[in-house]
């Protein structure tokens, strides 16, 4: 079968000009003009696709097959070029029959040339072939234009779908030119309108929670930096966690003398039932001399202190990817679930703007993984946002999955973020030791985003930084009143 590309070579037709005309017509379409005006940051991203459009149009010409009638006529023309004038005169009846059989536009003109010139000279032979070629060029050009026009319509339809998707998500995910380009690349997928509306929904929720967006900005843009010492150092405020033992009972740690009725030893409680010892019991109660269980725990609170500023002139280090672990237990349902998903969406926005990767892991009874900044990032984000938080809490599996991920070479400078209410069991010692090794040896940073004020201090103290976003009703009302 003869392809359109081969036909153009035979007839010496330049396909480059045809392709360029189609590209210009595509860029001049009213739909794109309106889109560029409404979303200027996406204009540059879209124009980066122009080389791909050219290649797609050229590929269409290379792969398309010409109609059988046109192919037969071209083959007849090629054979006629090889004939001498005397041979050509002998073949004229067959050539005329061929032109009529394939329905060539040149058939009538050829018949007139034959009828008007009973004696064919070499000049008429050349004229006949020139006009035949001209007719073939017109047919080939028309066929090329038809093919390219169909491809233009298909391209325009594809671009319109991507424009609709990118336009809807621009406000949610685009922060600068880089993120606009990455969003445009990710829009090259098969998504329906109802799918990406879920991202718009959580984007609207995030807009209603500016404190959550601010928290994501602080976490996402925080990074240790090299600095230069300065002699005259002013004081600066810094926050640190201080330990307050015995304020949060977690485990039995011996005996003590006190007046705590709820933690009395059974022998002490027995004296209360003996008449002769009842007054002795009350005396020891007043003097806080009753034997009781001592329950010891590790409570930590944030303390604000002053220290001299010893470093200035920061040289910020490059930021690495995010590995975000999200608790999907039942206690994280409802408003907590909305906040956790919106927070991850905010981190995705930051990752797109800073050309970073954002890897999400959901942990409950099993670990589910999503990468939000790959080529199929939008589809992955939709799947993540569609999840329901109804599982259990297995924080240890979460840390094991993070540690395994950080072993990969491409994640050597990643930041780990755990989003949870941290109402869970104690972490095994081997998990705690592994996290400390990653922090000490490999300089990985672990962030906690605490969605509750009741998280276990024993779990949270392994993190480098704790970002608090209390989702309790009181905190929600306070934030609303502050706006």
Swiss-Prot record:
GO cellular component, one term: cytosol
PANTHER family, alphabetized: PROTEIN VIAA
Taxonomic path: Bacteria, Pseudomonadati, Pseudomonadota, Gammaproteobacteria, Enterobacterales
Localization (cell): Cytoplasm
Organism field: Cronobacter sakazakii (strain ATCC BAA-894)
Stored NCBIfam families: PRK10997.1 (NF008230)
Source species, domain of life: Bacteria
Keyword Chaperone appears in the UniProt entry: yes
Name assigned to this protein: Regulatory protein ViaA
Assembly and interaction partners: Homodimer. Interacts with RavA.
Pfam hit, one: VWA_CoxE
Matching InterPro entries: Uncharacterised_CoxE, Uncharacterised_ViaA, VWF_A, vWFA_dom_sf
Similarity field: Belongs to the ViaA family.
Main location: cytoplasm
Primary role: Component of the RavA-ViaA chaperone complex, which may act on the membrane to optimize the function of some of the respiratory chains. ViaA stimulates the ATPase activity of RavA.
Keywords: Chaperone, Cytoplasm
Family matches, as Gene3D superfamilies: von Willebrand factor, type A domain
